[in-house]
Regions:
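Bacterial N-terminal signal peptides
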Residues: 4-17
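N-terminal nucleophile
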Residues: 19-272
Length: 272
């Protein structure tokens, strides 16, 4: 399933500033493992302005062993969309019905981008007509596996970005998180968000060659993990977050590259 639209009339009600974001979700039906990763050209102080601790806090919806979703584009700062998605995903509501509920109830839906995956192999996605000039989503199954994926984003430099990410994820043969990390790198290599660069504010304090986002994260939830009170506040098997204002001198000012560094270190040091 693929969707690509051009920007249309803005729907302002309930919308935060239009942040450019890309994300990748994948789940393994056999193990129940879920992985979601994302990067955005949004400064940390702008996330604080919508009362978000980080990008994941306002974007990801995680139901361990069952479903995963993202709500992005112009983030719903009221979090009503995120709460609705989580409540219905927990209940096992049909994903297309959840999408219909969002389209009917969210006054800012024209600037939203939402996507959902359920462990049964169900998926649904929507890219609002006012998200950006180049915005797209693509969902499907990795051939010969029980892995399902969803790739989505806006403000891409070309329409080649999402297909490159899908190819990277489907061609890679390692575990689920490595597939997602490789797809994140494919988007980064294609230019990520076209508005971000080494010169965009806030500028990095160390030498910078390329930068396609200000923040990034990756989360892996195993079937045995659980949430506490909210839609993404659980104790998960892995959670790595990169913010431009907390990148170390020995790391890369490009959050996607630093996410790779931290992920590799996590793999190296985790118990077998």
């Amino acid at each position: 399933m693929r969707c690509m639209l051009t920007a249309g009339a803005l729907v302002l009600a309930g919308c935060s500033p239009a942040f450019a974001t890309w994300s990748i979700m994948a789940l393994d039906q056999k193990s129940g493992t879920i992985v979601v990763a994302s990067a955005a050209c949004v400064a940390p102080q702008d996330l604080a302005g919508v009362r978000a601790k980080d990008l994941m806090d306002i974007q990801a919806i995680v139901v361990p062993g069952k479903a995963v979703a993202v709500a992005q584009g112009s983030f719903d700062s009221t979090r009503e969309t995120q709460k609705l998605m989580y409540t219905e995903l927990v209940k096992g509501t049909d994903l297309e019905h959840i999408l219909e509920m969002i389209l009917r109830q969210d006054p800012g839906v024209g600037m939203r981008q939402v996507a959902m995956l359920a462990v049964e192999g169900r998926r649904a996605g929507f890219t609002g007509p006012a998200t950006s000039v180049i915005a797209a989503h693509d969902q499907g199954q990795v051939g010969g596996t029980e892995i399902w994926y969803s790739v989505q984003g806006d403000n891409f430099p070309t329409d080649e970005v999402v297909p490159a990410a899908v190819q990277a994820l489907t061609d890679h043969k390692e575990d689920l998180a490595e597939r997602v990390m490789t797809a994140m790198e494919a988007i980064d290599a294609k230019g990520g968000d076209r508005r971000c660069s080494c010169a965009s504010e806030p500028k990095p304090s160390t030498a910078c060659e390329t930068r396609t986002a200000h923040v990034a994260y990756m989360l892996r939830a195993d079937k045995s993990d659980s949430n506490r009170e909210s839609y993404n506040d659980g104790r998960y098997a892995m959670y790595l977050s990169v913010s431009g204002d907390h990148i170390k001198p020995n790391e890369n000012p490009n959050p996607v590259k630093t996410l790779r560094m931290r992920y590799d270190e996590w793999k190296r040091t985790r118990p077998n």
